[in-house]
Structures are given as C-alpha cells and as structure tokens.
C-alpha cells in the first residue's frame, strides 16, 4: 500500500490567488513550496475553514471526473469506487495515487476549499451475510481509506466523509431478492446496530487518524428507490422507502449520528438529504443540518423559506440537473440561488452536479453520475461561476480574473484556462528556482471553445525542476500579475520503442491485414512520419507493441497524439493496454481509451494512466468500422 506519497506538488489555492503545482508524472521529485496560510493545522475543523475563508465552497469528488486524461469513466466507473471498489474493477489500484492527487489539485485551482467524498454511499466496504445482516468491514476498504486520506493530507484538502449509505442503486444489477436483502440495515434495528458496531466504528477509528483532514462526517436522511419499484415509495410524503417506516429509518440515522459523536467528538456532523426529510431529523445528533437541492434553478425559493434550529449547509447542490437551459437562464438561476441561501446566512455548499446545454460553448455537460465528463468543459463553467460568485459576494475584482492552471498532460506541456474576459498574456519559466524568463507572449494554441490554452515547451533542461506561470498583460482591466504556477519535472526515459514511427514499424507488429496499417509521411505530429490506421472491412485490426518491460504493481502513464483523416466516417479508434505476459490477451485489459474527440484539423492528445499487474505490457491500437486515424509520439513512463 502506498501510504506516504512523496510531496511533489508546489501549491495551494489562496482565495485571493491561484497557486497550483503540477507535474508530468515522470521523473525526479519536486521541492514543496506551500503557503503557510493554507497548511492544514494538526487538528482541523469546519470552524477553521470558516474563520480563514469565510465560507465553505465544496464539491463532491466522486461525481466530478474527467475524460481529459483518457480515463473515460462511466456510471459504474466513477471515482465513487476509488476507495470502496465494491462491484467494479475500477479503483484506486487501477488508476493510482497520482491521478487522484492531480484531481484534487485541479479542484483546488477552481476555488474549492473542501471536498466531499462518499465513502460508503452504496454500502462499499460492508460485508453482508446471506440473510442481509452486517457481519464486518472489508480490510482492503480500510487500507484504501487510509490511502485516500493520505493523498488528501498531501494535497492539504479538508474532507467531508459520508459514512453510511442512502442508496443501493448498484443492486439494480441484481434481482429483487438481493436488493431487499441489502436494505435490512434500514428496516431492522438489530441489523442497524450491527452496521454501527461492525462497520461505522471501525471506520471511525481510521478517520480519527486524520484530524487534520476529516473535518465533517455525514449520515443520510433517505434511501432512494433507484429500482423504480412501483410498490416502494420514496421517503417523502408517505414517509417510507423500501417499505421502511419513518421510525426505523430515524433509528438508523440516529444510531449512526450518535456513533459519530462518540467516536469522533471533534468532527462536525451533518446529513445529506432532501428538503422533505429535513424537519423530521432535527432531533438527530448533528452540528449542521444538511440540505440537498437539485433543480436549484426551479426550487430556489424553497430554501429561502426553510427554517432550522441548526446551522444550515447545502450538502448536495445541483444546478440544472439534467436540464439544458440557455446560458442566460443558467446565469440567472445561479444568481437567484445564491441570493436566497446567502440571505439566510447558510455556511456553504457542496456541488453535486451541474448540467447545461451541449452546444460546444463554454458551458457544456459537466458532472453527473453517468456518461463521460470532459474536464476542460468543467473547468470553463466552474471557473466562470467562481468568478461571478466572488465578484458578487467578495468583491475580489483582481483575483477573479486570473487564469487557472492545470496539470500538464505530457512532458513540457503547459495548460491553463483563461479568464472569461479577453486578455493577452506572457508565459514565463523558472529553472531550479532561478529567475523568471519569458517563453512566449502569444505562442500557445487555443481550443475550439477559445478557453483552454496549451503551450509545448521544447527546451526542457537536461535535469532539474521547471516552473511556469502565466501573467495577464493587457485586455483585462481588473487582472494583475497572477501567481499561478505549474511545476514540471524532468521526464524519465520513454519505454516505447520507435515511439514516433520514424523507423517504419520497427518494434511494432501488425494485427490483421484487412485495411491499411502502415507508416506514412502524409502527416505527423512531430518528425516526418506517423502511424496510419485505415479500416477495411474487418473490425478490431491494427498495430501493437508487445512485451514492453515495466515494473509490476506500479502506475504508468501512456501518452500519444491522434488525428482523424478527412475521409473518416466515424471516430471508432481504440487504444488498449494489456497486462499479463505483454501479448495480445483480450481478457487482460488494464487501461484503455476511446478516441472519440479527434478531428481532421489538428492533433488531439490522449493520456491513459494504469496500474501494472505483471512485468510486461502490450500497447495496442485498433480501429473499427469507419475509422481512418493517424497516431504519433507514443510515450510510456512511470508515475513516481
């Protein structure tokens, strides 16, 4: 288990400036440079955050994943499984510590000062017997919980941890008999007691090891009927779900809340639930009453009229929630929503999902369980929202218009999200802590939306640590020189033979002969040649490189560039990383990417992070019907 992740990251976000560290994932260790104002105290709390920042701006980490690094998470592969890994092969061991660390720093760069994590929202880690009784907690769940919290400590990100489930949607993949069995803890007091003694308390013992990280825990106020069984109601007007009466559910929630108060007396407690249920839980052993607000644009008036004897916290905030409003409607909904809950002096909110129209503008599909999420689009909308919020409620007219920098996707690749206003800039570099020198004043490329800037530094030094920062120079009246920085380490040796295809197909092997699979000089990302894969009439043929030597049980990153040909009728190209003995083994895929974002105008970068299960891997590029794609600059390096 990787307990002590080495500090390689540079930064922390201060609410007046964005300071972000980043790295390629390959190479030597970077020096830490963390602001003392942001370092987590030995015993942290919500009160510390409120005193420092004045407000909680949180996000539920499991539902905000991205496709920008080529992971392509789906509903059953979201990071909610990162620790629990209850019924999915996707988890912390597959994607590695570095991926999570990158995610946390990216969220901090967007302005969030606390992160929610649903540690057992779907009963992850719970051991049931054949009758549905709770008999224990999984040891690997406890180990991965420590591993997760070690990384949160490394990134200095406080956490709200959900310690009990309120939904069993995963059992919708089973039959009703199994489904009912897994809900006994809500209905039977003896099973609820066993859940507290055999799961909650052992988990609390681990959470207690992180008083600087775990500042709040959450129980639940409802169980969702995600089976859509017409005979089962939701825990609202009829006061029952799964046939569980209000009294039984209240017993379960209070048992969990009481255990939290006993085992973690210095950690605040809240609920995650809906308005309909909150009044019946005001007697629970809580320090904050949590409120869940979906369709916030249409129900904003409801929360303004809500009353509670406890401090209020919006624990699940979903704006849009599957609807596709116009940008104007989205902005108006934001303002109305904030005006209402701020007027009642609520302590903060945790973003759950954010949906808007998918026309390719700066607002697009963002975070929701199910489907893919493009983190670049996430960055645009969240960045803009935070700008608007700070301008309206904090008067931070300087900080709001700074760029947001992100982890680079490859060696020497620097990326940032520009402010909403037009600007000119200069990109500066510092080597080994030396003087800042100008790299470019306009040489970065811009994506189709016009928000993400990318610059490729081709003059990396032979060794040492390299820092970058972007400074707004003109065109934005409220912006000043930013302190945004991104840190890049000297890369390790690329493990891919003939990675740029400059030596024909040396090191690569053809798989099938139906179609065109060759090296061509028709186009190239760098150099003179690239790999061309043109579908014929037989699917799943292509080119692979077998037996690439790696370390077992180690996280690696594969990066490459691709571009579709003008005559491609579909974007159906794939890259597979196969473990085992490093050969074509269809049952041993340990990493993959679906190349569906490419176009004919420029090259698209793809990155796959994966964890090895042996001492060799196979890199496999395939096409299916309609695909005609070019591949270049394939790079494999170890995340250290």
In which residue ranges do the predicted regions lie?
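Active-site mouth of glycoside hydrolases
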Residues: 45-286
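Extracellular carbohydrate recognition
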Residues: 540, 602, 622-638
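Extracellular carbohydrate recognition and processing domains
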Residues: 584-616
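Extracellular glycan-recognition surfaces and repeat-rich motifs
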Residues: 502-534, 538
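Substrate-binding cleft of secreted/luminal carbohydrate-active enzymes
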Residues: 313-394
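Extra-cytoplasmic beta-strand recognition segments
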Residues: 150, 501, 531, 542-573, ...
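Extracellular carbohydrate-recognition regions
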Residues: 490-512, 640
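Pro/Thr/Ser/Gly-rich low-complexity, intrinsically disordered linker/stalk tracts
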Residues: 393-420, 479-490
């Amino acid at each position: 288990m990787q307990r002590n992740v080495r500090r390689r990251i540079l930064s922390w976000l201060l609410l007046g400036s964005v300071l972000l560290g980043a790295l390629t994932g390959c190479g030597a260790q970077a020096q830490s440079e963390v602001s003392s104002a942001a370092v987590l105290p030995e015993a942290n709390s919500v009160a510390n955050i409120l005193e420092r920042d004045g407000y909680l701006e949180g996000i539920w980490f499991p539902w905000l994943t991205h496709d920008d690094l080529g992971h392509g998470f789906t509903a059953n592969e979201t990071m909610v499984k990162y620790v629990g890994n209850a019924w999915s092969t996707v988890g912390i061991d597959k994607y590695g510590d570095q991926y999570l660390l990158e995610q946390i720093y990216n969220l901090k760069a967007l302005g969030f000062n606390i992160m929610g994590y649903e540690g057992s929202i779907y009963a992850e880690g719970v051991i049931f017997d054949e009758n549905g009784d709770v008999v224990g907690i999984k040891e690997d769940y406890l180990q991965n919980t420590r591993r997760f919290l070690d990384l949160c400590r490394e990134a200095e990100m406080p956490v709200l941890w959900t310690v009990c489930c309120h939904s069993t949607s995963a059992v919708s993949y089973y039959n009703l008999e199994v489904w009912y069995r897994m809900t006994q803890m809500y209905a039977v007091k003896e099973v609820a007691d066993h859940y507290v003694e055999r799961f909650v308390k052992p988990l609390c013992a681990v959470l207690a090891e992180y008083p600087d990280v775990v500042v709040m825990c959450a129980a639940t106020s409802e169980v969702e009927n995600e089976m859509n069984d017409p005979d089962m109601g939701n825990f609202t007007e009829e006061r029952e779900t799964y046939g569980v009466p209000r009294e039984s559910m209240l017993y379960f929630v209070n048992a969990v809340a009481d255990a939290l108060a006993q085992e973690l007396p210095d950690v605040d407690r809240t609920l995650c639930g809906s308005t309909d249920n909150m009044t019946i839980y005001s007697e629970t052993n809580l320090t904050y009453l949590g409120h869940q607000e979906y369709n916030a644009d249409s129900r904003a008036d409801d929360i303004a009229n809500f009353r509670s004897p406890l401090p209020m916290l919006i624990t699940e905030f979903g704006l849009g929630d599957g609807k596709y409003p116009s940008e104007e409607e989205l902005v108006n909904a934001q303002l109305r929503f904030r005006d209402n809950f701020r007027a009642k002096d609520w302590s903060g909110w945790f973003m759950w999902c954010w949906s808007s129209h998918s026309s390719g503008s700066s607002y697009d599909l963002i975070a929701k369980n199910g489907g893919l999420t493009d983190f670049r689009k996430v960055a645009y909308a969240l960045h803009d929202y935070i700008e608007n919020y700070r301008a309206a409620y904090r008067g931070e007219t300087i900080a709001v218009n700074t760029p947001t920098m992100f982890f680079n996707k490859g060696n020497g690749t620097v990326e940032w999200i520009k402010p909403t206003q037009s600007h000119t800039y200069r990109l500066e570099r510092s080597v080994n802590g030396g003087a800042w020198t100008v790299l470019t004043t306009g040489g970065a490329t811009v994506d189709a939306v016009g928000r993400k800037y990318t610059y490729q530094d081709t003059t990396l030094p032979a060794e040492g640590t390299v820092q970058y920062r972007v400074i707004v120079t003109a065109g934005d009246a409220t912006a000043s020189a930013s302190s945004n920085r991104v840190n890049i380490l000297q890369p390790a040796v690329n493990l891919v033979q003939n990675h740029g295809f400059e030596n024909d197909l040396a090191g690569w092997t053809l798989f099938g002969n139906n179609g065109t699979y060759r090296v061509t000089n028709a186009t190239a990302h760098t150099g003179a040649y690239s790999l061309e894969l043109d579908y014929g009439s037989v699917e799943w043929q292509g080119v692979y490189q077998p037996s690439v030597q790696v370390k077992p049980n180690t996280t690696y990153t594969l990066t490459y560039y691709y571009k579709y040909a003008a005559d491609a009728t579909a974007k159906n190209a794939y890259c597979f990383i196969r473990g085992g003995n490093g050969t074509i083994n269809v049952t041993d895929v340990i990493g993959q990417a679906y190349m569906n974002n490419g176009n004919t105008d420029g090259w698209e970068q793809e990155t796959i992070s994966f964890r090895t299960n042996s001492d060799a891997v196979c890199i496999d590029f395939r096409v299916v019907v309609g695909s005609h794609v070019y591949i270049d600059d394939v790079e494999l390096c170890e995340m250290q």
